[in-house]
Each structure stands twice: as structure tokens, then as C-alpha cells.
Amino acid sequence: MDPAAPGLACSILRLGLGLLLLCSWWYPGSAEPRAPPEKIAVIGAGIGGTSAAYYLRQKFGKDVKIDVFEKGKVGGRLATLNVQGQEFESGGSVIHPLNLHMKRFVKDLGLSAVQSPSGLVGVYNGETLVYEESSWFIINMIKLIWHYGFQSLRMHMWVEDILDKFMRIYRYQSHDYAFSSVEKLLHSLGGDDYLGLFNRSLLETLQKAGFSEKFLDEIITPVMRVNYGQTTNINGFVGAVSMAGTDPGLWAVKGGNKLVCSRLLQASRSNLVSGLVMSIEEKTRTKQTGNPSKVYEVVYQTGSETHSDFYDIVLVATPLNRKMSNINFLNFDPPIEEFHQHYEPLVTTLIKGELNSTVFSSRALNEFHLGTVLTTDNPDLFINSIGLVSPVEEDNNPQPKADTAHVWKIFSAAALTKEQILKLFVSYDYAVKQSWLAYPHYTPPEKCPSIILHDQLYYLNGIEFAASAMEMSAIAGYNAALLAYHRWNGNTHMIDQEDLYERLKTEL
């Protein structure tokens, strides 16, 4: 070997390094990362807002101050009601075994999962039980095939196909990819087929697939009524999410699903502000560096006092519905579009008493073995469903007994009158109710509100118009945190990327 070769190689290496350093000095793409924001506001402490705060902390680091505003209780629509010293779920109640964000939260936050009650189910049409489960699997299969052919199997396969594509979102988010609209997120999961589900009614989708009117009326509609208080006129995507709620293995968080929100808030090291946000306005402020910068002034009320503070980034994680969060967006140019879509009223009633089983069948209570009764779309029916429930601390399935009063949960569109309660129960010891604007009223074709309302102003709850569920809100919270992080740092290559599934499936 030429003895001069090592020296020549070193000279070339030094020259190359010098050129690289010179290039990095002037090349604009290699500028230092932008300094993190000083303050971030999250409005709403439900599962969407608290998961967003959790992921914002992970992305932006320990120094940013995060304020989470909540006018009510942490948890939002995840809540419990007390029945004679025991707590029962009154809001979002069950979690699917494939809801990976919720599973991760429970594991990482030191919580425990309990299996949801899985008693026998019947369907009531106002006159009789048109379908009734047996405790024997083979008998259930025979009943379903006898009444509906193989439509239940076809429905299972249809839902499985949609869920299989839906699972792609976890891979995208694990690689930090974000989406600027709900439509782009859905398209990334399943292409035009997913958007088709979103823009057509479940009824139209399933009729085209050859499902019978009898199957739709007696099996599908009752599931929509218990989960979303609506019929098969909802969009096909939320219909699939609703049908997934009939899968085995559903679970909940021991102590109440709302514990996930309070633990996420703690883990994010956010500051909880108990107040009502009244307005958001873009302002220009001079920071410590002496340079003017755009910020958002959040005006909020605590008790009788009005306060304000300034934030670099704001995430709105509460429905922009005048009855739920009357936030005014002031002096934006162009004005921020108002989204006041209708939310469906729902009343949850918990009653401890002895069920009048003869309302649903001719059998006495000691011969009535159903744990849940769903209903068809009959205007004469005043309930969507009724079912036995367990306290949030217990891990067992309640079984009806003739000699013992049990706690039953009833979903209805309006508050039950005393006469209606006495029709459902032979006697009762205690009744408590909670009224909700629970989920959007679905009227496909849907138009989801924008996620990006302004430069650094984001809205999470638009995803509810695709489907409203705990896991959907957690996905929206993660997506909004990633979107805010990438837009703050100019990482446009991490937003709205096409063909992610094909690109990522080849990675190890």
C-alpha cells in the first residue's frame, strides 16, 4: 500500500468535513429546531383533552406549561352515579379489546381492567321478545340461522374487515404521523371505501350488501339504539363501531372509566384550571427575546371572576355546541367557521328495584333470565334499553334473582316519569338519573369540522362525527398533539402522507 494513502485519506476526510460544516452553516433546511412553546392550553378534561395533554407532554418535553381547562368534572362524559353508596357507570361504559390506546393507558397508569357484564340479551318490539339469547352457544347459532340465515356471520365478517383496516391507525401513530382532517385520516385507513361508509347511511350500506329488512329491524337497529340512541340512518362507519360493541371481551376500568382521565392529567403534569372558557382571540405579544409573536388570549370564568391568559398553542377538546361549550372566537381573519351540530339527548337512569318481567314476556321474574333487553324502533317504546349493571369496583356479572333488588341501567331519549318507572318495576328502592348530550346526531353524508381552526388552534371533537367513542377521542387527542408538534416545528413530511400502509408494512 502507498504510505501516502492514509494521509491523503485524512486530508480528503477533513476537506469533506469542512465542506459539510460550511454547508450546514448556510443551508436553511438544517437550522436548529424551533424552541418549544412556552404555554399550551387544552380546553376540556374528558378522554380527548387529557390524552392530548399526555401526548403533548411527551412531544414537547418537560419545560412547556400545559393548562387544562374544565368547567365540570374531570372525565367529561365518562362519569359515575351513586346508588346507595356504590358507584355505577353513567356515561361511556365499555371498551373493546382492540382499543389499544385505552389498554395502554390502563397499563401505563397503574389501573386495572374488569370484564363488562355479559348476561343474556333479548330484543323487545313493544309486544313480544322477537329474539332471546340462550345460555347454550349452539342453541343461539340455531336460532340465528333459523330466523336470519347466515346474516349474523356475514355481519361479523363485515365488521371484522372494517376493524382490520381501522387498526392501521396505531401503526401510523406509533411512527408519529398525523392528519390535518378526519377525512384524510379515514382515507389513510381504508381509502375511498372508508369515506363511502362515512358518507352513506348504515341502512343504505347494508341493504346494498343484501341484508334483510327483518335482520336490520330486529338485530342491527336495537344495537344502534343502545349504543347511539339512533337507528340505521346513522353513517356506516359509526354503525360498524356500534356493532363492534357486541363483540365478546368488552371491559371497563376498575373504579370507573373516568379514572383514566384523572391519571392522564396527573401523568401529563398539567395544571387543572376549574373554569369556563368564554372566548379565544389571536393577539400579538412581545416575548422575552424582544420579538413580537402571535399568541392566543383565552378568557375564562372561575366562579364570579373573569381571568385571561396567553398561549402559544390551544387545543379545543370539548364539542363546539352552544349547549355544551359556548366558546366565542374573536377577531380572527378569516373568521373561524362555527360548528354547532346537533348532539343527541340521552338520559341514563339507574334504578334499584325488582323488575316487572311481565312487561317483556309472560314469565315471572324467577323464570326471566335476561340481563339486558334491547328495543326495536317503535315510537310507542319509551326506553332504548334496560340492563343489569355492577358497581365499578366489582368484577362479576350480575344475575337477576326474584328475591333481591338489583340495579338496572335504562337509556331513554327523555326522563322517565314515575308512571313509566312503575310500569317497568314491581317495586323500587332508589332511582337516580343523569342527562347527557351524549353523541352527535348522525345524518350522512357527514361533514366533519376542521381539526386546524387557525395556525396553532386545533379542534379534537370533529372525529365524533365519524364515530363517538372513548378510543376515537383518544386517537383524536394523540393526532392533535402530533399535528401541533409537527406544525410547530415545520415537519410537513409527517402530516397527511399518502400510502402510509404500503410504506410502513415493509418496515421491521
Swiss-Prot record:
Where mainly found?
other
Spell out the subcellular localization from the entry: Lysosome
The superkingdom listed in its UniProt entry is Eukaryota
- The EC number of this protein is 1.8.3.5
Q: Which residues form the signal peptide?
A: 1-31
**Glycan attachment points:** 199, 291, 356
Stated name of the protein: Prenylcysteine oxidase 1
Which species is the source of this protein? Bos taurus (Bovine)
The record's gene field reads PCYOX1
